[in-house]
Amino acid sequence: AYITGENFTDFYNQSEGTLVLSADIAYLPTSNQAAVVFEDESSASTDLIALGYRVGGGSSGNLGSWYQGNGSQVAYFNHNAGITANTEFRQAFAYKKDNLASSVNGGTPQTDNSGTLSTSIDRVKFGGYYADTMKSGHIRYFKYFNKRLSNAQLQGLTTQ
């Protein structure tokens, strides 16, 4: 499922924002099971913000938060979260120029203080991205804030 056009541009902020996800995955062997992706429709592999199970690779049980802009990796956070099948996880990712962070299940946010943001992201996609799709599982909820929330807020929003 996609949100595009004015339905997307009316709420998306290119300069800063925060994504919050609650989901579970039933099938663990496959990597790159993105639950939510903000991407450039014309170049989905070069401009994206992705959250989910083993996004960007990573080992079994890991969650990834990945920001790619203008064909280059801006930030990649690989959380060793110990995810098991059919168990809820909560993940948050915040972006602003030179101020990116990701938190999982109430853990201390991982941060990156450098990076130029994409100006061409134009849609949100649920359940997959260019590399693969969610094989089995549920997106319990997704929230988007059009400002960069604090690291403490990221941690609080992901506490179970």
Q: How would you name each of these model-derived features?
A:
Residues 31-52, 64-69, 104, 155-158:
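Aromatic-rich beta-strand patches that line glycan-recognition/binding surfaces
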Residues 22-24, 39-41, 50-55, 92:
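Beta-propeller domains
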Residues 52-115:
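Extracellular glycan-interaction surfaces
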